[in-house]
């Protein structure tokens, strides 16, 4: 066993940390400690706020003094972290923008945004290892594991609140590039179809169009046509799970190499292009800076595999 923090810590809550639940605060502070252990030390009174016992749902206030006891975690977890150091180092090359308030990353395909569900490494865990001095690092939004591109991370709670408000007001614009099956029809500029999320017996999440689902809208624009495929820009108005992927399928144009909603025959037509990952890339994000109010537009370049795929398709003659 290894001690996560070897002595009792007394932490004074700052204005930026105020407003969050004590359990969430401890999960962020005691990295690698299971949730069950967090709730156990709170329930047993080992964690105290202003010298008094509290419940897991207690919301911290500015100036609160939190007593955090020594917590022991398995050394096996430490070994797993060290084994991922190469991935952590690679994340440093993916940073597109960073200041005191936020960090913007070009997330690689195949990397989850969060560890869990059998995954020991995610982007947020990697960033916390890369920036151990950062007191606060939280995802503003999510990207599917196989989707690459712009991912926004808040470095202050005030920044997270501001950016979440922009998401709620739909003032943040996200633009994706997707390679879809067949010839996308020019008149199809938006898909409005309610989406319902189902959990299969295997635990896999599957989303489908259903009248019982939540209202969902994605806008589409043709970027380039090829013999068997179309490169489209997809801009989600709402932010449902797998929204672009399911809306593209609903339009009759599933995304290339989508192992959940795609067509294998289409994937086979792309043999020779070097593509073997989902062709969905968060290409650009426009938002207001949470501190300055400046309008920012961050773009993420395509990775080599996506870029080479498009070059191969162009060589096979672009459809005019």
From Swiss-Prot:
The keyword Ribonucleoprotein does not apply. It comes from the Bacteria. Keywords: Isomerase, RNA-binding, rRNA processing. SUPFAM superfamilies: Alpha-L RNA-binding motif, Pseudouridine synthase. Its EC number is 5.4.99.24. It catalyses: uridine(955/2504/2580) in 23S rRNA = pseudouridine(955/2504/2580) in 23S rRNA. InterPro entries: PsdUridine_synth_cat_dom_sf, PsdUridine_synth_RluA-like_CS, PsdUridine_synth_RluC/D, PsdUridine_synth_RsuA/RluA, RluA_PseudoU_synthase, S4_RNA-bd, S4_RNA-bd_sf. Residues 20-83 form the S4 RNA-binding domain. The active site is at residue 144. GO terms for biological process: enzyme-directed rRNA pseudouridine synthesis. SMART domains: S4. The keyword Transmembrane does not apply. Coiled coil: none annotated. It is an enzyme of class 5 (isomerase). Responsible for synthesis of pseudouridine from uracil at positions 955, 2504 and 2580 in 23S ribosomal RNA. NCBIfam families: PRK11025.1, rluA_subfam. PANTHER family: MITOCHONDRIAL RNA PSEUDOURIDINE SYNTHASE, RIBOSOMAL LARGE SUBUNIT PSEUDOURIDINE SYNTHASE C. Belongs to the pseudouridine synthase RluA family. This is Ribosomal large subunit pseudouridine synthase C. It comes from Yersinia pestis.
